[in-house]
Curated annotation (Swiss-Prot):
F-type ATPases have 2 components, F(1) - the catalytic core - and F(0) - the membrane proton channel. F(1) has five subunits: alpha(3), beta(3), gamma(1), delta(1), epsilon(1). F(0) has three main subunits: a(1), b(2) and c(10-14). The alpha and beta chains form an alternating ring which encloses part of the gamma chain. F(1) is attached to F(0) by a central stalk formed by the gamma and epsilon chains, while a peripheral stalk is formed by the delta and b chains. It comes from Syntrophus aciditrophicus (strain SB). It is found in: Cell inner membrane. Belongs to the ATPase B chain family. This is ATP synthase subunit b 2. F(1)F(0) ATP synthase produces ATP from ADP in the presence of a proton or sodium gradient. F-type ATPases consist of two structural domains, F(1) containing the extramembraneous catalytic core and F(0) containing the membrane proton channel, linked together by a central stalk and a peripheral stalk. During catalysis, ATP synthesis in the catalytic domain of F(1) is coupled via a rotary mechanism of the central stalk subunits to proton translocation. Component of the F(0) channel, it forms part of the peripheral stalk, linking F(1) to F(0). One of its GO terms (molecular function) is proton-transporting ATPase activity, rotational mechanism. Its main location: membrane.
Length: 274
């Protein structure tokens, strides 16, 4: 069985970095925020219970004072009960609305912080993995990672089926701008020439125009673009799987920690999550 040590090592480094960042930056903040929210919610419920007890005490005193009235006792007691029930319902409804509002704001805050953290983690992890991979290749193979990316792109171009090659050839004929090769870092001149020769020979277009650009949006990747056709390889492909796993773990952790009210879901469903 062939083992791709480059991919294995990159995934291992991704996992170690993820565990470290999760423990150092995110978990403590989430627990602290949840504790603060829980304290506020508990305070609201305590206030509601206090108001309820006060209302019940007021009803008891009211009933005792009016028990001496003749003829109007039942009527006044009924009025007192109605007042108490109405006030109690108002207080409980108000407390419930405030608790629900606090919970919704907390969920929105967590989701926003999670999205920002995931994006920051994705960018930072990608750069660190790319730097580590570059160092490993330099140390072990005396080969720049940019050259390896070109090798991968050339292999993917060679693996195109005839129908896909024909589509790309037609696109190049119809386009005045030619093809574009974008990479996260500048390619060496010899790698550019090697890639240019490969594309021209394989597609049978010796005069095909190929322009090279650098794009900060690519995280350790390279892509070939020709009028809507795209052939690419990028570390971000691996990071997307890592981000999905992290998102799932984070969602499960928050769902288990946050208290769930009856009849209401704490966290949004998968369709509602960003």
């Amino acid at each position: 069985m062939h083992i791709d040590w480059f991919v294995l090592l990159a995934q291992l480094v991704n996992f170690l970095i993820l565990i470290y960042l999760l423990k150092r930056f995110l978990y403590t903040r989430i627990i602290q925020a949840m504790n603060e929210r829980e304290a506020k919610i508990a305070a609201r419920f305590d206030e509601a219970e206090r108001l309820k007890r006060e209302a019940e005490e007021a009803a008891r005193v009211y009933e005792e004072k009016n028990s001496f009235l003749q003829g109007q006792e039942e009527k006044m007691l009924n009025q007192a009960r109605e007042v108490v029930n109405h006030r109690q319902k108002e207080w409980m409804d108000s407390a419930r609305e405030e608790v629900d509002a606090i919970r919704r704001r907390w969920i929105e805050t967590v989701l926003q912080e999670k999205a920002a953290f995931l994006e920051h983690l994705r960018q930072r992890t990608g750069k660190q993995v790319f730097a580590i991979a570059r160092k490993i290749l330099d140390d072990l193979a005396d080969t720049a990672i940019e050259s390896k990316m070109v090798d991968v792109l050339i292999d993917r171009i060679h693996s195109l089926d005839p129908a896909e090659r024909e589509k790309i050839c037609s696109a190049l004929e119809d386009s005045e701008e030619g093809a574009i090769v974008q990479s996260a870092f500048a390619l060496f001149p010899e790698d550019r020439q090697r890639l240019t020769d490969t594309v021209r020979d394989l597609l049978g277009k010796p005069d095909a125009v190929i322009r090279y650009q650098e794009s900060s949006d690519l995280i350790g990747g390279i892509e070939f673009l020709a009028s809507g056709h795209r052939i690419a390889w990028s570390i971000s492909d691996y990071l997307e799987h890592l981000e999905q796993d992290f998102d799932r773990v984070l969602h499960e952790e928050v769902r288990q920690t946050l208290p769930k009210p009856s009849g209401e879901s704490v966290m949004p469903s998968e369709e509602q999550r960003p």
